[in-house]
Amino acid sequence: MNGSSANPRAALSSAMTDPFGRTISYLRVSVTDRCDLRCFYCMSEDMTFLPKADLLTLEELDRLCSAFIAKGVKKLRLTGGEPLVRRNVMTLVRSLSRHLSSGALSELTLTTNGTQLAKYARELADCGVRRINVSLDTLDPKKFREITRWGEIDKVLEGIEAARAAGLAVKINAVALKNLNEDELPSLMRWAHGKNMGLTLIEVMPMGEIGAGRIDQYLPLSLVRARLAQQFTLMDLAESTGGPARYVSVAETGGKLGFITPMTHNFCESCNRVRITCTGTLHTCLGHEDASDLRKPLRASDDDMLLADAIDRAIGLKPKGHDFIIDRRHNRPSVSRHMSVTGG
C-alpha cells in the first residue's frame, strides 16, 4: 500500500505491501543501541550512545509494535544493541505476548549475545518466546575476548544452556571473519549441530564507522561454502523465510546451515521485513540510508490513525534492493549508521 489512505480508519488494519509487491509481515525492533560487548566488526571501542532521553519508552515501543501487528506483522523480533540490557525490557516482552495469546502474532523472538540469558531464559519462555538467535563467532575464549574486546565466553555458554533447559530452540549466528575464525567454522558447526542448534554464517556488513578496515575482516561465504563442501555433504534446501538466509542440510551432522551473503548475493527479491530503531525511526532496508520518523506521529495523538498513515507512507518508500558494497578505495562504510542502532 503506497501513499496516504483515502480512508484513515481503514489504514489502521490494512496490510502493508511495498511498491514491488512484497508483503511486510516481519518487524525487527531495536529496543536499545547499548550493548555490554564491543564486537569490533559492529562497534567502535569508544562508542557514543544515544541519549536516553531520545529513546522511546517501553510503552511507546509496545504501541508502535501493536500498530504494525494490526497491519499484518506476524513475526516480531526484539534486537539491539543487546536487547536484554534495556532496563525493564521483560515488561515489554510480557506485554507483547498478549498478541501471541490472541493469535494476531505468530512468533515473538529476539536476537541476543547471550550474556544475560542465564537470568532471563525462563521468563522469556514463560512469555511465549519459543526460539532465539544467539550471536557467537567463536568457541575459543581468547578469540572471543579479541572479537568482543572484553567478553567472557563462559557467560554466553551458560546462557545458551539455560535457554535450552528452558525449552527454547537456539540458533547460532556467526560472522565469518578473515584470518580470525575462518579455520574454526567447521568445528563451530559440529558443536552447534551436536546440541541440535542451527548455525547461520553471516558476511561482514559495511555499516557504521568502526575504526578498522572491513576489507581486512571480509570473508566471502562463497569461499567458506566451497571449503565446507570439501569436508561435508551439503544439500540445498528449498525452504524460504522471506529473509536473507539460504539453507543447506549437512548429511554428516544432521543439522542445518544457513548463509547470509549481502556482499556476494543480493537477497532482496523476497524481503518481507522492516526495522524500527529505539528512537522510533523506521528503516525499510538494512542496507539503505532511508529513514522515516514514526516518533512524531506516535506522540502527536493517542489515536493511531496518524501513525498508521505514516507507516503506509514509509512502506511506499521501501527500495528494491540494498546498497551494500565495501569501499576499498576510501575504506568507508556503505551505510553510516551502526548495526547496533539499526538492530540487524
UniProtKB/Swiss-Prot annotation:
The pathway entry for this protein reads as:
Cofactor biosynthesis; molybdopterin biosynthesis
Q: Which residues bind [4Fe-4S] cluster 2?
A: C268, C271, C285
What NCBIfam families is this protein classified in?
moaA
Q: Pfam families recorded for this chain?
A: Fer4_12 (PF13353), Mob_synth_C (PF06463), Radical_SAM (PF04055)
Q: Which gene is this protein's source?
A: moaA
Protein family (similarity comment)? Belongs to the radical SAM superfamily. MoaA family.
* Radical SAM core domain span: 19-244
Entry's cofactor comment: Binds 2 [4Fe-4S] clusters. Binds 1 [4Fe-4S] cluster coordinated with 3 cysteines and an exchangeable S-adenosyl-L-methionine and 1 [4Fe-4S] cluster coordinated with 3 cysteines and the GTP-derived substrate.
Keyword Nucleotide-binding, does the record have it? yes
Q: EC number(s) for this protein?
A: 4.1.99.22
Give the catalysed reaction(s), semicolon-separated.
GTP + AH2 + S-adenosyl-L-methionine = (8S)-3',8-cyclo-7,8-dihydroguanosine 5'-triphosphate + 5'-deoxyadenosine + L-methionine + A + H(+)
Keywords, in A-Z order: 4Fe-4S, GTP-binding, Iron, Iron-sulfur, Lyase, Metal-binding, Molybdenum cofactor biosynthesis, Nucleotide-binding, S-adenosyl-L-methionine
Can you say what this protein is called? GTP 3',8-cyclase
TM helices/strands, residue ranges:
none
The positions annotated for binding [4Fe-4S] cluster 1 are C35, C39, C42
Q: What does this protein do?
A: Catalyzes the cyclization of GTP to (8S)-3',8-cyclo-7,8-dihydroguanosine 5'-triphosphate.
**UniProt cofactor(s):** [4Fe-4S] cluster
GO BP annotation list:
Mo-molybdopterin cofactor biosynthetic process
Q: How does it assemble?
A: Monomer and homodimer.
